[in-house]
UniProtKB/Swiss-Prot annotation:
This is Transcription initiation factor TFIID subunit 11. CDD domains: HFD_TAF11. GO terms for cellular component: transcription factor TFIID complex. One of its GO terms (biological process) is RNA polymerase II preinitiation complex assembly. GO terms for molecular function: protein heterodimerization activity; RNA polymerase II general transcription initiation factor activity. TBP and TAFII18 bind to distinct domains of TAFII28. The TFIID basal transcription factor complex plays a major role in the initiation of RNA polymerase II (Pol II)-dependent transcription. TFIID recognizes and binds promoters with or without a TATA box via its subunit TBP, a TATA-box-binding protein, and promotes assembly of the pre-initiation complex (PIC). The TFIID complex consists of TBP and TBP-associated factors (TAFs), including TAF1, TAF2, TAF3, TAF4, TAF5, TAF6, TAF7, TAF8, TAF9, TAF10, TAF11, TAF12 and TAF13. Residues 1-14, 46-74 have a biased composition (Basic and acidic residues). The keyword Transcription regulation applies. Keywords: Acetylation, Nucleus, Transcription, Transcription regulation. It is found in: Nucleus.
Amino acid sequence: MDDAHKSPSDKGGETGESDETAAAPGDPGATDTDGIPEDTDGDADADLKEAAAEEGELKSQDISDLTTVEREDSSLLTPAAKKLKIDTKEKKEKKQKVDEDEIQKMQILVSSFSEEQLNRYEMYRRSAFPKAAIKRLIQSITGTSVSQNVVIAMSGISKVFVGEVVEEALDVCEKWGEMPPLQPKHMREAVRRLKSKGQIPNSKHKKIIFF
């Protein structure tokens, strides 16, 4: 009797549950994804090709951008800047050509030296003033310490100066009809002649008096 008096809703609920249970094993709406093999290799190859294509496009774009920037920079240069750039390039080429000419002239000159002249030239090239002595001399005169570049420059200038004095002394010795080695009188006469030519500055300061 109790079963007969159950509400229709209770019956319907039981019926719905049994229907769901029966439909679950063979649900036609459910998709069986496990049974379909995934094409992962094909997708990976496609992704790699796409990435390579994008990278190539980016590289070509960067190159074109750089070329455009260079063209814009060259177009933005004023005529004066362009002329300065051309002048600098021409000066550099001219200097290189002059250096090559000087080297060639020096080679021709050395090849024409006699044995005595060649020995003197080699001795002159190898000779050098001691930098420590030059540095002490400069510091004693100026009263301040100097850099190594100043010492090197003064050492080179001193070498050139001594070479000019010796050359003039050799000319004096030849004009006097005497033979080397050089003597103090030849050196004194050479210094006197160089001073008279204005090639050696006067070490004694003379006060100029206006009348």
